[in-house]
């Protein structure tokens, strides 16, 4: 009976050791995961902030909810308009499409990419009906294969062309423009025509 008791005690001890070892391994994995997550989250955020500060003198941040223990802040350059996960800048200069994109890149952004109707509605509220504004949408080959500047898929269900547009293959760039009786909509235009433009960049989250 004593031997059986000792054997049972040894068996329980082994189980306990295995459980402790397993718990230790899980804890180690959790710690490593937290360190990696912190590095990528804060490291990338710091890098992005550094990049933005080379183009913009100040940032404006807005509370956008909370994590488990802290608030989430979404930040945009001071003169930019925040919406969703992006920041938008309406250029007052008129340039060719390529120059407009170059100017956006110089600010750490790109010509605007419109993904939803709510985004389109927000953007047109910021615009002057007198002007036409370049979008980050073009048809480089003039064959109807429209492409967004950031490689976002050109969605069939997210298009806001004016009626009967696009209608001319030589007009290989897109703009958003207000037409009397029709309101705001997209229009294909010559890329070397001069227009205002809209830049977009992702918010910085702190």
Swiss-Prot record:
Residues 37-206 are extracellular. SMART domains: CLECT. The keyword Disulfide bond applies. Keywords: Adaptive immunity, Calcium, Cell membrane, Disulfide bond, Glycoprotein, Immunity, Innate immunity, Lectin, Membrane, Metal-binding, Signal-anchor, Transmembrane, Transmembrane helix. Gene3D superfamilies: Mannose-Binding Protein A, subunit A. It is a single-pass type II membrane protein. Residues 1-15 are cytoplasmic. Ca(2+) 1 binds at residues 113, 115, 119, 200. Ca(2+) 2 binds at residues 165, 167, 171, 187-188. One of its GO terms (cellular component) is plasma membrane. Alpha-D-mannopyranose binds at residues 165-167, 171, 179, 187-188, 195. The chain crosses the membrane at residues 16-36. Expressed at the highest levels in lymph nodes, at moderate levels in skin, small intestine, liver, and lung, and at lower levels in abomasum and spleen, but is not in the brain. Abundantly expressed by Langerhans cells compared to macrophages. Glycans are attached at residues 58, 128, 167. Its main location: membrane. GO terms for molecular function: calcium ion binding; carbohydrate binding; D-mannose binding; pattern recognition receptor activity. GO terms for biological process: adaptive immune response; antifungal innate immune response; defense response to fungus; innate immune response; positive regulation of canonical NF-kappaB signal transduction; positive regulation of cytokine production; positive regulation of T-helper 17 type immune response. It is found in: Cell membrane. Disulfide bonds join 61-75, 76-87, 104-199, 173-191. Calcium-dependent lectin that acts as a pattern recognition receptor (PRR) of the innate immune system: specifically recognizes and binds alpha-mannans on C.albicans hypheas. Binding of C.albicans alpha-mannans to this receptor complex leads to phosphorylation of the immunoreceptor tyrosine-based activation motif (ITAM) of FCER1G, triggering activation of SYK, CARD9 and NF-kappa-B, consequently driving maturation of antigen-presenting cells and shaping antigen-specific priming of T-cells toward effector T-helper 1 and T-helper 17 cell subtypes. A short stretch of the intracellular domain (AA 8-14) proximal to the transmembrane domain is required for association with Fc receptor gamma chain. Associated with FCER1G. Heterodimer with CLEC4D; this heterodimer forms a pattern recognition receptor (PRR) against fungal infection. This is C-type lectin domain family 6 member A. The lineage of its organism: Eukaryota, Metazoa, Chordata, Craniata, Vertebrata. The gene is CLEC6A.
């Amino acid at each position: 009976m004593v031997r059986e008791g000792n054997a049972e005690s040894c068996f329980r001890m082994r189980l306990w050791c295995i459980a402790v070892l397993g718990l230790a391994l899980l804890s180690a994995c959790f710690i490593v995961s937290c360190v990696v997550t912190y590095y990528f989250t804060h490291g990338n955020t710091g890098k992005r902030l550094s990049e933005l500060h080379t183009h913009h003198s100040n940032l404006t941040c807005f509370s956008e909810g909370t994590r488990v223990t802290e608030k989430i802040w979404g930040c945009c350059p001071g003169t930019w308009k925040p919406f969703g996960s992006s920041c938008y800048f309406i250029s007052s200069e008129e340039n060719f499409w390529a120059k407009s994109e170059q100017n956006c890149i110089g600010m750490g952004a790109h010509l605007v990419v419109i993904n939803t109707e709510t985004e389109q509605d927000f953007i047109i509220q910021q615009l002057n009906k007198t002007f036409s504004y370049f979008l980050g949408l073009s048809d480089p080959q003039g064959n109807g294969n429209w492409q967004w500047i950031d490689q976002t898929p050109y969605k069939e269900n997210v298009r806001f062309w004016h009626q009967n547009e696009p209608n001319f293959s030589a007009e290989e760039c897109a703009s958003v423009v207000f037409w009397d009786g029709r309101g705001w909509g997209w229009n294909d235009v010559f890329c070397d025509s001069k227009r205002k433009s809209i830049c977009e960049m992702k918010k910085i989250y702190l």
